[in-house]
């Protein structure tokens, strides 16, 4: 067993832990290694649909927001690969997911702290350190701190959990499966960006010409991503700090209100989709027009021939049946800590709903020594807000974690922005308090 433990061991190598590794590359005194079961870096390769684009700025990359001179930036990727001037001439409003995935892979190839084909089987805390049982290592890997970044798990609705996997699968597998859907009735479940992209691919015949297309969504309509300037303020360090300070009921209320800030359909995708649907009767004469069913809650499913889906219309509360040969689930993801942490499970603090509790430094509360932390990325949507699961603030979060790890502010993490001002200023005059007392019990608009 090594006598010199790591300062940080990362479990999982997705974009979020990759960001931490990229920033730590400039800190040779910090000993860090990151482990993943995959043979090489990949990022949602099963969802790299033709024409799919990122829903955030390419400047919100692994490092630029806190260290613009870092060599692992997206701009340096363009320069080093001879793409900078062509990129400028392309004048694209958003880069493709394929290019962003290539950028992430380029960074991964240039980092020596990453260990692929090394799944972590279990983690224990012994003798003042975390001990990781890693495949390929004869002795445990010891580390003073952990950072858990194992990503997200596809959410399968309970109604669909027993359907045959060859005929009902999650959209994250789409490009791996490359299904032949020619002549089949296809139902897409889920009204977000991935659902829209799958439907667009079906309309374009990417997987063959289906006999019928049905799109079911629980949302009341197929709604756009809100990319307007003031909504984008939710994706700033100042707003995250403000959000953290609120009580849980208020945070839940805000998350419901802000859903379309992170989980809508890109307006460009919606426009293209609507135009395809408008042209469909002319371009596909004699074929049934695609059926769009928003405002439906999925109740039950039967896996016979064909698959039968039972949904309830939220408008009139009536039940409807949809029959399909294939069902593609665009139903989002779940956040779970990996099974390798089960030996530590009883030591992690949970809230009343059974969720883990990341603090302002993204460290989970546990009963171990305060100087041995378990950082977790993408586990704090309720505590840190709508930006937590997005790429937008990943380098800022990485900087917060690294500053906390090393004990001083190496990176700027307070943006100082005051537009808009989220909190009230203290009353400057006693007359303000008297005015408030006089009207405190009135209703407001």
Regions of interest found by a model, annotated:
Residues 2-39, 43-45, 87-193, 197-445:
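Flavin (primarily FAD) cofactor-binding/catalytic cores of flavoenzymes
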Residues 65-98:
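A conserved beta-strand/loop capping segment in the N-terminal third of enzymes
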